[in-house]
Curated annotation (Swiss-Prot):
Job of this protein: NDH-1 shuttles electrons from NADH, via FMN and iron-sulfur (Fe-S) centers, to quinones in the respiratory chain. The immediate electron acceptor for the enzyme in this species is believed to be a menaquinone. Couples the redox reaction to proton translocation (for every two electrons transferred, four hydrogen ions are translocated across the cytoplasmic membrane), and thus conserves the redox energy in a proton gradient.
Protein species of origin: Bacteroides fragilis (strain ATCC 25285 / DSM 2151 / CCUG 4856 / JCM 11019 / LMG 10263 / NCTC 9343 / Onslow / VPI 2553 / EN-2)
InterPro entries membership: NAD(P)H_OxRDtase_bac/plastid, NADH_UbQ/plastoQ_OxRdtase_su3, NDAH_ubi_oxred_su3_sf
Pfam families: Oxidored_q4
Protein name: NADH-quinone oxidoreductase subunit A
Membrane topology: Multi-pass membrane protein
Gene name for this UniProt entry: nuoA
Length: 116
């Protein structure tokens, strides 16, 4: 196959983007002052360090939600064709559910479901 036209179009697109970015940098106004380099937080001047690390406690809930949400994505198609799969399909989905229940029990035991 001849990809010459595709290469020409791709190079033209890359060149066009490069020209637009260079032109934007060349003609954009620049005014450097002290206020431009300050952190802006809701209009309130910051005191101390503007960035500080803090713990987020809800990420475990989000991960557990995603885990069980993905479970439903696998369960719905299985429920539609459950009769066609036979005993092998039943055993595989039961294994899948047992692993998920064990994961939930582990998370519960470790206190991941408690808001601290």
């Amino acid at each position: 196959m001849n990809f010459t036209l595709l290469v020409v179009v791709l190079l033209t697109a890359i060149a066009f983007v490069g020209v637009v970015i260079a032109l934007s940098n060349a003609i954009s106004p620049r005014s450097y002052n002290a206020q431009k380099f300050e952190a802006y937080e809701c209009g309130i001047p910051t005191r101390g360090k503007s960035w500080m690390q803090f713990r987020v406690g809800y990420y475990l809930f989000a991960i557990l939600f995603l885990m069980f949400d993905v479970e439903t994505v696998f369960l719905f198609p299985w429920a539609v064709i459950a009769r066609d799969l036979g005993p092998q399909g039943l055993i595989s989905i039961l294994f899948f559910l047992v692993v998920l229940v064990l994961g939930l029990a582990y998370a519960w035991k470790k206190g991941a479901l408690e808001w601290k």
